[in-house]
């Protein structure tokens, strides 16, 4: 549709820059961004990724962002990513003042009032974004600017949305020397590559004090599961596309 969209994964709080393959948490995809990418690409939008874990520092980020020259950037934000996400947003507006900035993810949903105070943010998407984010992109592509900054996500039918766009990460990683023939870094040695993680549902039947309140904010209290046929179809796709040997 002519609109260039760059998604940003700011996950450098743990292992820092140049950290691809430096442990399991530096070799997994963000299913949130991968799902948003799949939904946006299904509607014809040009989507690419900047994964801060693959870069060498903020100057490198500036260079890559200037090369991509996006019309829209989308930043996912967990609370641990708060500082690098803020910095990425500030640099994005510095590099291209006209870029439309969108943030979403767990921190935005759970700490909305705090997120509203983050500078350089045009729109905030709470909850699940597979319906809301492409809708925003369609409006922007038509020259419209939604009047409200906060856009409430709508829970999608999990069998109706596209499978996670793992190539969003894999193609980006390979630009920076990722040479493992696997969509993701295996969790343990007993899970041989090619390896991938799969999300079979949203919400949780348990009541752990650490993550359950956040799950409820993001996905609601009801557990939603994909059908067995839908999960098997994704597994078959992963075997055909990546010769999948193990998954979790």
Question: Which positions does each model-derived feature cover?
Answer:
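Glycine-rich beta-alpha loop elements in corrinoid/cobalamin-binding modules
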Residues: 32, 36-165
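Radical SAM [4Fe-4S] cluster-binding motif and immediate context
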Residues: 167-248
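A cross-family glycoside hydrolase active-site/sugar-binding cleft signature
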Residues: 8, 76, 102-104, 199, ...
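Short loop/turn segments at strand-loop or loop-helix junctions that form parts
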Residues: 8-12, 213
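Glycine- and acidic-residue-enriched helix-capping/strand-helix junction motifs
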Residues: 17-33
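N-terminal [4Fe-4S]-dependent radical SAM core
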Residues: 11-20, 142-200
